């Protein structure tokens, strides 16, 4: 870098002068502090005011930065309209898990103690209570037993329960339902979207624009209560859960009941929930558990593609791994590759382990970043009326008493063709942080972004003057010192030149060599080397 000339150095020193900068800076108050003249009371007051304003500004900036670092969020609720809505999945389970007419002596041998609390000596009496003959002499139980096959064979069949089905006025049937295993046994899901089936939609709200089904709960197939056990059902009817297609049902925890002898109206409203990921929230699209790997819950079905992440699915996979580690098997409604637990494993290990785990709530499952829920309002009326009882009895070849005690109607529909959008949003964005800092800067010190650039420019001038100027001055001093030494050497040679004879000289040989030691416009000193 070329060292500055005298004029450039003077200009640079003027630019780095604090008084010059204070008079030209757009920051308020500096001109009153660093103006010409000595220290006065007025200048001291201005300095105090500027320092207090600067301290207040820095405090506000620190508070705003701290608040931004806490990553607060806000929740907004918006009512939105839609031309059509996807109809939810509807899962149905009969409260009675097994039909009495389908139980065999082999079933009681394997599952009687675990499921019904029966002692082996009570099997014959229980079979008589079921209206079935006792085990024949020489009865030999099967060497193995599969709980999933028991529920698939002895559970209530939808073909027998479903008396009538209509979706938006169009007939539907058992083929529109998908078999799924839950903790309540074999259940059925309408509009599940399984196997890539197209999801049903509705363009209208209100009754008659959704699913309407008539069911026979088959109360005569309910198992007799032999002993009071922990999960003994005393009610009659079905359990219903309305949920999104992306999550498996948890009907034993989230389902509501529908009783025979009533028509239950379920008015739904779709809620689309959107959560924020860290650091503003805790949502995730995958479980924080690295072992999370959702698999189909149908123990009799073939594996299919993994469903999207959901809170219920994550908990179900977590419970399955816990039971598999504790018992070496899994319950029939759980995903995984472990074998299904035997009835004795259900009683001695799986059910107690699962209940203990649910009490501790040890599964780490964050909320999904996007999910769909359905708010419900239930109302009901008694059926059948006196006018319709005889007609229904004749139509289904049943007595009027049977119709009253076993038949129910379930009507599920959207209240209106709109949905609620519940969204989490960052409560304090970067733009708001910059806006607050800019506002505080203008309020307290009368500065802006350009003022900061002015200060940076001044600091560059100071650096160039004080730091780089120091090295330039040092280099110039070294150069001047070198020139002084050279001049002294030349002066030394000049002092020896007068001892030479300046009178007439003998002629020199032509081969002589002369060297000029010093020259000027007046004289030239020569040293002759012979």
UniProtKB/Swiss-Prot annotation:
Comp. bias (Low complexity): 298-307
Keywords linked to the UniProt accession: Cell membrane, Cytoplasm, Disulfide bond, Glycoprotein, Ion channel, Ion transport, Membrane, Phosphoprotein, Sodium, Sodium channel, Sodium transport, Transmembrane, Transmembrane helix, Transport
Record: glycosylation sites: 176, 397
Regions crossing the membrane: 44-62, 441-460
Stretches in topological domain Cytoplasmic: 1-43, 461-530
Residues in the Extracellular compartment per record: 63-440
Catalytic activity: Na(+)(in) = Na(+)(out); K(+)(in) = K(+)(out); Ca(2+)(in) = Ca(2+)(out)
Ranges spanned by the short sequence motif GAS motif, renumbered to the chain: 446-448
Region (Disordered): 285-307
Gene Ontology biological-process annotations: detection of chemical stimulus involved in sensory perception; detection of chemical stimulus involved in sensory perception of pain; detection of mechanical stimulus involved in sensory perception; detection of mechanical stimulus involved in sensory perception of pain; detection of temperature stimulus involved in sensory perception; detection of temperature stimulus involved in sensory perception of pain; establishment of localization in cell; membrane depolarization
Keyword Mitochondrion applies: no
Extent of the signal sequence: none
Pfam families: ASC
Subunit structure: Can form homotrimeric channels. Heterotrimer; forms functional heterotrimers producing channel with different properties. Forms heterotrimers with ASIC2; gives rise to a biphasic current with a sustained current which discriminates poorly between Na(+) and K(+). Interacts with STOM; inhibits ASIC3 acid-evoked current. Interacts with LIN7B (via PDZ domain); increases ASIC3 expression at the plasma membrane. Interacts with MAGI1 (via PDZ domain); probably regulates ASIC3. Interacts with GOPC (via PDZ domain); probably regulates ASIC3.
Protein name listed in UniProt: Acid-sensing ion channel 3
Gene designation: Asic3
């Amino acid at each position: 870098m070329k060292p500055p000339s005298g004029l450039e150095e003077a200009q640079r020193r003027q630019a780095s002068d604090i008084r010059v900068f204070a008079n030209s800076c757009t920051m308020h108050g500096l001109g009153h502090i660093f103006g010409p003249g000595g220290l006065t009371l007025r200048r001291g007051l201005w300095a105090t005011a500027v320092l207090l304003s600067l301290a207040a500004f820095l405090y506000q900036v620190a508070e705003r930065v701290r608040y931004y670092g806490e990553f607060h969020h806000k929740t907004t609720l918006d009512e939105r309209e839609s031309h059509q809505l996807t109809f939810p999945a509807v899962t149905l389970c009969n409260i009675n898990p097994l039909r009495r007419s389908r139980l065999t002596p082999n079933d009681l041998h394997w599952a009687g103690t675990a499921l019904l609390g029966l002692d082996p000596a009570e099997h014959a009496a229980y079979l008589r209570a079921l209206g079935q003959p006792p085990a024949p002499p020489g009865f030999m139980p099967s060497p193995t037993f599969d709980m999933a096959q028991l529920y698939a064979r002895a559970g209530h069949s939808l073909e027998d329960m479903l008396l009538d089905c209509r979706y938006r006025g169009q007939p539907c049937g058992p083929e529109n339902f998908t078999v799924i295993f839950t903790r309540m046994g074999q259940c059925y899901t309408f509009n599940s979207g399984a196997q890539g089936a197209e999801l049903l939609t509705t363009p209208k709200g209100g009754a008659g624009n959704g699913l309407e089904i008539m069911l026979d709960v088959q109360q005569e197939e309910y198992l007799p209560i032999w002993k009071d056990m922990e999960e003994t059902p005393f009610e009659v009817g079905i359990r219903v859960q309305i949920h999104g297609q992306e999550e498996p049902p948890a009907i034993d925890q989230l389902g509501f009941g529908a009783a025979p002898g009533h028509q239950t109206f379920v008015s739904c409203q779709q809620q689309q929930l959107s959560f924020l990921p860290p650091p503003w929230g805790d949502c995730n699209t995958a479980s924080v558990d690295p072992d999370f790997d959702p698999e189909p819950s149908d123990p009799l079905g073939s594996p299919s593609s993994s469903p999207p992440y959901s809170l219920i699915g994550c908990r179900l996979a977590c419970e399955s791994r816990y039971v598999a580690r504790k018992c070496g098997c899994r319950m029939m409604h759980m995903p995984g590759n472990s074998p299904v637990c035997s009835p004795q494993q259900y009683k001695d290990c799986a059910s107690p382990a699962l209940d203990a785990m649910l009490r501790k709530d040890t599964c780490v499952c964050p909320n999904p970043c996007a999910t769909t829920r359905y708010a419900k309002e239930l109302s009901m009326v008694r059926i059948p009326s006196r006018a319709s009882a005889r007609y229904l009895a004749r139509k289904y070849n049943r007595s009027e008493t049977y119709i009253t005690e076993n038949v129910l109607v379930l009507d599920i529909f959207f209240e209106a063709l709109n949905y609620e959008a519940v969204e989490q949003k960052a409560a304090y964005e970067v733009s708001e942080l910059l806006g607050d800092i800019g506002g505080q800067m203008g309020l307290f010190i009368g500065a802006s972004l350009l003022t900061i650039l002015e200060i940076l420019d001044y600091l560059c001038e100071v650096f160039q003057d004080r730091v780089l100027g120091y090295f330039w001055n040092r280099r110039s001093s070294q150069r001047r010192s070198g020139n002084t030494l050279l001049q002294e050497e030349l002066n030394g040679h000049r002092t020896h030149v007068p001892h030479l004879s300046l009178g007439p000289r003998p002629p020199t040989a032509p081969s002589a060599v002369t060297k000029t030691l010093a020259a000027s416009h007046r004289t030239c000193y020569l040293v002759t080397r012979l």
